[in-house]
Amino acid sequence: MSLIKLPILIDPHTHCRDFEQNNKETFETATRAALAGGYGYVADMPNHSHPIVDKRTLGELKDLAEKQIVTDLGIYLGVTPQSVSEAEKNFRECEGEVRGLKIYMGETTGGYIVDSDDDLDKIFRTWESNKPILVHTEDKSLVKALELAEKYKRNLYVCHVSRKDELELIDKFRQKRKNNIWVEVTPHHLFLSDKMSISPFGQMKPPLSSDEDKEALWMAVIKGEIDTIGTDHAPHTREEKMGIKPPSGVPGLETTLVLLLRAEKEGKISREKIIELTHNNPIKIFNLNKEKYDRAEVVLVEEEFLIEENNLKTKCGWTPFKEMRVSHKIVEVNFDGKIGYKDGEILAVSGSGKIV
Ligand code: DOR
Ligand code: ZN
Ligand code: ZN
């Protein structure tokens, strides 16, 4: 029985839910799912039932999360059309406590889209920080984000790139080298495509793309054009997904590492690349404590099995990767000097994670 060890994973893109959406997930269940999937750090997206946009909402999130988390947690500040007028004050008061600023430049869960040119210009101008501006973009809004980041020399982190034409566009802007542009890809865009009939459980934003796009994403991974893998873990209940208007989003924290290791076995990605995308690069981009996360590790055993829903720790209890064959099982996760997960059980105590 051969064991393998990897440094613990860092997820720059998780939706922990909680608040009025604690039927979908809570900080506790999200971070338990994270630990079971080999993650020691997740960064929470601000599109909560009430968005995290200022000192007050940031404080509420911290109060709610700190007693629950079993991994470390990062926070992003959000900005909505309603909060733009207070941008200067909010950014000044919150910049030190967050890992970056998230802007929804496309319609998605929560409905916090900012699409006025004036608002967007003001946001990019006012965020005078080296910490990245993260963008959810679809179609035309990607050009806008790239142009504004270049205009104000801001560090830009493009979430969930899913298509070949987006990669080409980003490449053009990168050649000018005026600012940092980091690119994230999700496990669902790497491992699923629009040919698979898994709707509504495969409905997310941006939607699953063609096999050609998927291949372009893998090529970009190999060529070094992708910086991180963000799970975009976005749980919704089974009932909601099966309703007449299913919400967009899929869970991903518990399946990403094993899927990547299967891809390694198939010769699609190297072990070094997996570590770069899930550990080294997120630590660098978000300026995290390298020593702490370098010491933490995930132990896996080589064993073929099918991904099953009844073993999941996420509260939503389903996965779009159901019944996919994988080649490794996570047996132990060591985090912060302790065994946090072992053989299906979470041993880490609620509240043991830190907000950083
Ligand atoms: O599919 C998605 N779900 N895409 C997003 O950008 C947001 C997320 C969510 O919060 O449900
Ligand atoms: Zn998004
Ligand atoms: Zn997201």
Question: Each PLM stretch: what is its role?
Answer:
Residues 38-43, 69-73, 128-132, 148-156, ...:
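Short, surface-exposed connector motifs at secondary-structure boundaries
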